[in-house]
Amino acid sequence: PKLLFEYIDGAASDGSGEAENRRIIRHFRLKTKALINVEQRSLNHKVFRIPTKLPVGIAPMGMVQMAGVGADEEFAKFASKYEIPVGVSTAASMSLEKYAEYSRGYAWFQLYYMADKAELEKLLNRILMAGYKTLIFTVDVPEIGFRPNEIRNGLKVPFKFGPKQIFDFALHPAWSLKTLMNGAPKFGNFTDTNSFNRGASRAGADWDFLRYLRDHWPNKLVIKGVLNTDDAINMK
């Protein structure tokens, strides 16, 4: 359906950030060296000292079940097959426990700022109990971005159906029938749809919160979204 395609394919605001990222990436070049024996070669790598079979990982993405039934499970199984990290979004449409199971331990949980310390500690304990060794804390989204595609198409989670959405779904029967048989995508880590607000402010995140998180999380902690060298140095 159009509203889901534009959610996946689109970008925030006028798309200038995405365009700038693409422009920069196009300027990267690989410089090869000649006359080096490469009969024995491997893509094996280490990501934060964790051995992997590929020098990549799968970024955390919320509600990927909207793209297709079983999408979360496929991501987790792919991570297991190639022994690469898969980021589990707080807003994932499959539970963090199932991600840990299907990925065979290659899942890293991505956490947003939470003002409620009691709920945060409850979630951290749940993540630990599921066997997670790495936590990703997102710091570059203090407020949710302006997403005109979602506003224009009326995309909301949980799904709210109106004439526009029903007409869109009717034009894509394969997706609609499969989704109807399996149920509308929902947040996999929260049984109460009101317990997680995708658009909630995360503006309260600060250095004190990071220290608090470091004190309450015993395993590896990855900070996602650091764009300033001074911040990176301070985080060491």
Which residue stretches match the model-derived regions?
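An N-cap/entry alpha-helix motif that binds or orients negatively charged groups
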Residues: 2-49, 157-205
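Glycine-rich beta-alpha junction loops
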Residues: 139-143, 227
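Short acidic active-site motifs
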Residues: 95-98, 209, 230-232
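A structural motif corresponding to the C-terminal end of an alpha-helix
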Residues: 208-221
